[in-house]
């Protein structure tokens, strides 16, 4: 795929995510948000103290991105991510990355989802060079458009916010089953 094709696809994915973000639901106000200014020094600290099982609150102080990710995992092995939703606000990169992530991991086994998260993280570490692994890049589907973001260290955190939240939310959902 040429650079201009990737740039056009990037624009389309970002615009689509802005208009119709996948997996976004407006959660009822929770204790994390309400207690952020009262019970803890930071929103992140308060959020982690009050999240429910299968839920993770992430905050990027550099950009102001904030998202709460909720994961529901099947009761039997191999554990599958049955439902993945999020609520939050932030820049178009964080919102688009969350939307693409939901499309990629919902319905996958936990192992498959963690492998995709690892692949996306490696893409962000590539500094615009890609993965040199066509199969890995193809596994990211629309997520490959974030290759351009990997050239900007301050924006990498925006793209990774939801992925880190997904990993944490899934881990909490699995821990609640133990």
Describe each PLM feature range.
Residues 64, 88-90, 107, 148:
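Glycine-centered flexibility sites
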């Amino acid at each position: 795929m040429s650079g201009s094709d990737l740039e056009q696809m990037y624009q389309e994915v970002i615009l689509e995510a802005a208009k119709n973000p996948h997996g976004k639901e407006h959660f009822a106000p929770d204790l994390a948000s309400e207690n952020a200014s009262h019970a803890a020094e930071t929103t992140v600290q308060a959020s982690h103290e009050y999240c429910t099982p299968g839920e993770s609150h992430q905050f990027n102080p550099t950009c102001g991105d904030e998202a709460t990710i909720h994961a529901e995992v099947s009761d039997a092995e191999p554990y599958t991510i049955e439902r993945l939703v999020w609520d939050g606000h932030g820049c178009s990169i964080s919102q688009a990355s969350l939307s693409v992530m939901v499309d990629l991991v919902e319905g996958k086994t936990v192992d498959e989802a963690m492998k995709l998260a690892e692949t996306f993280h490696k893409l962000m570490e590539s500094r615009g060079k890609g993965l040199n692994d066509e199969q890995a890049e193809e596994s990211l589907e629309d997520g490959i458009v974030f290759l351009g973001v990997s050239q900007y260290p301050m924006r990498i955190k925006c793209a990774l916010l939801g992925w880190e939240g997904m990993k944490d939310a899934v881990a909490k959902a699995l821990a609640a089953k133990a």
